[in-house]
């Protein structure tokens, strides 16, 4: 009998499917062909006589799990990492970040900064991301070169941007981007990103949402990140931010709201009723002293909450393992309840909930036959991971992105034994250092 040929065969010690049933499989074997998972079983049920593989990854004392999903970031801002810290959000934005972007953001910077950030994500177990920035064709090009799965958002804001000097022509930029990338790669999906209700007029918010609905793509925006934002929107429109957006009819299941730190109970109910999904960014919110989003309350109302890192300039890393740890702990403190945000729930937020937030739940977020082969392999042979009683506990409270040995995206091994295989990381790091030197010189003036 002819053997079934696999592109990749993976063996490990433990596998987390992130399905409701059969969540943990001991001594697993995963078979991959044409970018899809074609078998998952225990090793003692696997027979060498039935299968042959072009490549085998066989490591003892490893954990296999779905790749992590970062539902909110600004990748090219890796070039601004550490430029301005320990500041309130509005001072950070208006005194440092917006001026730096006006001077330095160009296609070359966005490509190099995005690719550097993708290396950081791949090395720390993220396989899919949602990014909002400028010159987004360069973000998409970098994602294609890196082999990452991506939702890439064209940004909108009611003042001149690095890629569009006339705000009234931002939609032309977006239309070109969507036309180029909507069907260019199965791994890349365009989306539209309104910066926030305080930087986008009601007309802009509605116009961009209408375009997103026409194109059947995701609509993303920052929402209620700070108390100051809430007060500003109330003063301008007489409503709290989420109610303002609801009044504009821009909230629906294809809306991803980021931060959501200062939602009151009525606003949470509106988001739940509209099916809006939320990206929680705890480390950025802590660093900017924005506050703690009411995630347990939102989840109790049925709102799907995923995890994002935000950009490197406000975090300052892109390691979702650190976000998981922060998520589990910060809400225990905020609620006074140590049972809130258990480890398994937090891992779901970084995997299956993230996939759902981006509309990719049929493709990624769990390890199942027929789904895309987006997975990571962690090295459990570490002092801080020995012994292991409960895998979810270790992933949230003990592991870090540095424990990821291998990253597979769409069946392709993009990182193996901590080495990026899909592009030249050293060359990109050198390029970003050149960009940073220009930024340093401008800061001295």
Curated annotation (Swiss-Prot):
MF-aspect GO terms: 5'-methylthioadenosine deaminase activity; metal ion binding; S-adenosylhomocysteine deaminase activity
Cofactor note: Binds 1 zinc ion per subunit.
The protein's name in its UniProt record: 5-methylthioadenosine/S-adenosylhomocysteine deaminase 2
Positions bound to Zn(2+): 72, 74, 222, 310
Residues that coordinate or bind substrate: 101, 195, 225, 310
Described function: Catalyzes the deamination of 5-methylthioadenosine and S-adenosyl-L-homocysteine into 5-methylthioinosine and S-inosyl-L-homocysteine, respectively. Is also able to deaminate adenosine.
Highest taxon listed in the record's lineage: Bacteria
Reaction(s) catalysed (UniProt annotation): S-adenosyl-L-homocysteine + H2O + H(+) = S-inosyl-L-homocysteine + NH4(+); S-methyl-5'-thioadenosine + H2O + H(+) = S-methyl-5'-thioinosine + NH4(+)
InterPro entries reported in the protein's UniProt record: Amidohydro-rel, Deaminase_MtaD/DadD, Metal-dep_hydrolase_composite, Metal_Hydrolase, MTA/SAH_deaminase
Record-listed E.C. numbers: 3.5.4.28, 3.5.4.31
Cofactor section: Zn(2+)
Originating organism: Syntrophus aciditrophicus (strain SB)
Pfam families (UniProt xref): Amidohydro_1
Swiss-Prot/TrEMBL keywords: Hydrolase, Metal-binding, Zinc
Family per similarity comment: Belongs to the metallo-dependent hydrolases superfamily. MTA/SAH deaminase family.
Gene this protein is translated from: mtaD2
EC class name: hydrolase
């Amino acid at each position: 009998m002819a053997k079934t040929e696999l592109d990749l065969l993976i063996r490990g010690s433990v596998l987390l499917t992130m399905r409701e049933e059969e969540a943990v499989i001991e001594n697993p074997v995963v078979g991959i062909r044409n970018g899809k998972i074609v078998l998952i079983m225990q090793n003692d049920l696997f027979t060498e006589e039935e299968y042959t593989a072009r490549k085998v990854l066989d490591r003892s004392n490893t954990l296999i799990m779905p790749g992590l999903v970062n539902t909110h970031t600004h990748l090219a801002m890796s070039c601004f990492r550490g430029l301005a810290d320990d500041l309130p959000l509005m001072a950070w934005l208006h005194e440092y970040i917006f001026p730096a972007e006006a001077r330095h953001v160009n296609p070359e910077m966005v490509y190099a900064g995005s690719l550097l950030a993708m290396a950081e994500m791949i090395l720390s177990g993220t396989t899919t991301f949602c990014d909002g920035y400028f010159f987004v064709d360069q973000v998409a090009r970098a994602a294609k070169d890196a082999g990452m799965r991506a939702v890439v958002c064209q940004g909108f804001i009611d003042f001149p941007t690095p890629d569009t000097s006339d705000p009234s022509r931002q939609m032309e930029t977006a239309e070109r981007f969507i036309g180029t990338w909507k069907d260019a790669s199965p791994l890349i999906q365009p989306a539209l990103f309104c910066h926030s209700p305080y930087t986008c007029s009601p007309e802009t918010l509605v116009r961009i949402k209408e375009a997103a609905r026409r194109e059947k793509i995701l609509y993303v925006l920052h929402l209620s990140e700070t108390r100051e934002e809430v007060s500003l929107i109330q003063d301008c429109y007489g409503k709290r931010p989420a109610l303002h957006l609801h009044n504009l009819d821009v909230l629906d299941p294809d809306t991803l709201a980021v931060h959501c730190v200062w939602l009151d109970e009525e606003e949470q109910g509106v988001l739940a009723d509209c099916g809006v999904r939320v990206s929680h960014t705890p480390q950025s919110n802590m660093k900017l002293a924005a506050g703690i989003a009411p995630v347990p309350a939102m989840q109790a109302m049925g709102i799907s909450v995923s995890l994002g890192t935000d950009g490197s300039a406000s975090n300052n890393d892109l390691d979702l393992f650190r976000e998981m740890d922060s998520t589990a702990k910060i809400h225990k403190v905020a609620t006074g309840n140590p049972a809130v945000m258990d480890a398994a729930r937090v891992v779901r937020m970084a995997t299956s909930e993230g996939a759902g937030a981006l509309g990719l739940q049929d493709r990624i977020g769990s390890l199942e036959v027929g789904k895309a082969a987006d997975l990571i392999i962690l090295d459990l042979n570490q002092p801080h991971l020995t012994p292991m009683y409960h895998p979810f506990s270790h992933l949230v409270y003990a592991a870090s992105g540095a424990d990821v040995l291998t990253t597979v995206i769409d069946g392709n091994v993009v990182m193996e034994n901590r080495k990026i295989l899909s592009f030249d990381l050293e060359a990109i790091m050198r390029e970003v250092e050149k960009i940073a030197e220009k930024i340093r010189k401008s800061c001295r003036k």
